[in-house]
């Protein structure tokens, strides 16, 4: 009897691990783009050589970070280091020796940011249901040096015209006590399609440990602080495919649930999963020192990176040390037993730094109407190789895709 109870207990607590081994998760995500190194469509070989000679382009310093899709366009973010000609780009239909060539968005003039009027260092992007591209520009070069104020930019994707450009004040962008700040993640809460409508944008400061709320209707900012935004010193060592590095990082990935209006987040250097309900922010019924943050400490077995969420409340997130993608359904108890690994690949999932859940129209017609389904779009980039060195003869950067329903089939991420 005791032995049976023990086995039953182990079966419950280790159920996720058992399921992982019983399912083939290696090819759950399909690679749709891949690069050995990042290169651009400069317009001519002469212009490309000039960019190399001037130092504007150095292929060894270009690292893929984020992505999003709209129509036939796939947008990509390249971390802004010296040698990166453009941080906000689209993938062209041209291919170089490293992979598909990129082109700056909206055009090259925006990438040449000599007076801080263009784009310095796009870090994260999000496309809303009103065909608008929201761009978070950290203003940082080499991830540390601030050369321009951070800003939010909004583009009309139908015309590629700028709708709005808002500089983020210094006392909002940094922790005024430590003077540290790095605005590296965002989530858009669409409330209106009007240019100056009451859309809210949530921005994570992963060095100053804060959550920033931008109100599009009046261009106001609010900086919130909480211990849940801070890194945990126990989890500042990251190991990816046997290579370790140290990083003290706060909020990195966020996802806003369309079902509950919960904003899910976690400090990158932690094993936690947290959330805050945004209804109080929408109704302006809150005080900065009286916001209720919820979540679970040490619910994860490794650090969580980028996040995305489906319309019916399935939260997806990258697991750094596990080289995997996991999910949890917010209709279930927030408990480790309800977290499922749905994709795992030591080769193709080394550090998921960008993640979106998108809606696509299928060519399949049901009763005369096109079938709509959701898919996961992910970036993996071997980020540890920034320290250990990339082999540019090997594939280093990937964009992957999978149908949401296929990923969660026969898992606890299906709604109860």
Swiss-Prot record:
It is found in: Secreted. The keyword Phosphoprotein does not apply. One of its GO terms (cellular component) is extracellular region. Keywords: Glycoprotein, Secreted, Signal. InterPro entries: 6-blade_b-propeller_TolB-like, Royal_jelly/protein_yellow. Its main location: secreted. Pfam families: MRJP. Component of bee sting venom. Component of royal jelly, a substance produced in the hypopharyngeal gland containing proteins, free amino acids, fatty acids, sugars and other nutrients, which is fed to developing larvae by worker nurse bees; may be present only at trace levels. All larvae are fed some royal jelly (also known as worker jelly) early in their development but it forms the principal source of nutrition for larvae destined to become queen bees. This is Major royal jelly protein 8. It comes from Apis mellifera (Honeybee).
């Amino acid at each position: 009897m005791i032995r049976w109870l023990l086995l039953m207990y182990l079966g419950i607590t280790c159920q996720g691990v058992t399921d992982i081994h019983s399912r083939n998760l290696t090819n759950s995500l399909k690679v749709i783009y891949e690069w050995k190194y990042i290169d651009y469509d400069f317009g001519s070989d002469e212009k490309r050589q000039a960019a190399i000679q001037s130092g504007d382009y150095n292929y060894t310093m270009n690292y893929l970070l984020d992505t999003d899709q709209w129509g036939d366009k796939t947008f990509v973010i390249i971390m802004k280091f010296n040698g990166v000609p453009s941080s906000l780009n689209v993938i062209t239909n041209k291919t170089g020796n490293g992979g598909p060539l990129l082109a700056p968005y909206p055009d090259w003039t925006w990438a040449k940011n000599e007076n801080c009027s263009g784009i310095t260092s796009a870090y994260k992007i999000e496309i809303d249901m009103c065909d608008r591209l929201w761009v978070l520009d950290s203003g940082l070069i080499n991830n540390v040096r601030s050369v321009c104020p951070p800003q939010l930019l909004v583009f009309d994707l139908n015309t590629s015209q700028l709708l709005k450009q808002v500089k983020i004040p210094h006392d909002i962008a940094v922790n005024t006590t430590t003077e540290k700040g790095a605005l590296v993640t965002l989530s858009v809460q669409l409330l209106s399609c009007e240019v100056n409508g009451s859309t809210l944008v949530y921005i994570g400061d992963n060095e100053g440990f804060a959550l920033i709320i931008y109100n599009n209707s009046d261009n106001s900012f609010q900086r919130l602080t909480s211990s849940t935004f801070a890194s945990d010193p126990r989890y500042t060592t990251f190991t990816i495919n046997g290579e370790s590095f140290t990083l003290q990082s706060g909020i990195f990935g966020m996802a806003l649930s369309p079902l509950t209006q919960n904003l899910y987040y976690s400090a990158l250097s932690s094993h936690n999963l947290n959330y805050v309900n945004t209804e109080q922010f929408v109704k302006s019924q809150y005080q900065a020192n009286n916001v209720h943050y919820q979540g679970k400490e040490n619910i994860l077995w490794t650090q969580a990176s980028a996040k995305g969420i489906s319309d019916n409340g399935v939260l997806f997130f990258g697991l750094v040390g596990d080289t995997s993608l996991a999910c949890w359904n917010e209709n279930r108890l927030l408990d480790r037993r309800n977290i499922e690994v749905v994709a795992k690949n030591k080769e193709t999932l080394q550090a998921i730094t960008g993640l979106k859940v998108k809606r696509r129209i299928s060519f399949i017609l049901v009763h005369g109407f096109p079938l709509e389904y959701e898919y996961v779009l992910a970036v993996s980039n071997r980020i540890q190789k920034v320290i250990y060195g990339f082999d540019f003869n090997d594939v280093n950067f990937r964009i992957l895709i999978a149908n949401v329903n296929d990923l969660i089939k026969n898992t606890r991420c299906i709604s109860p």
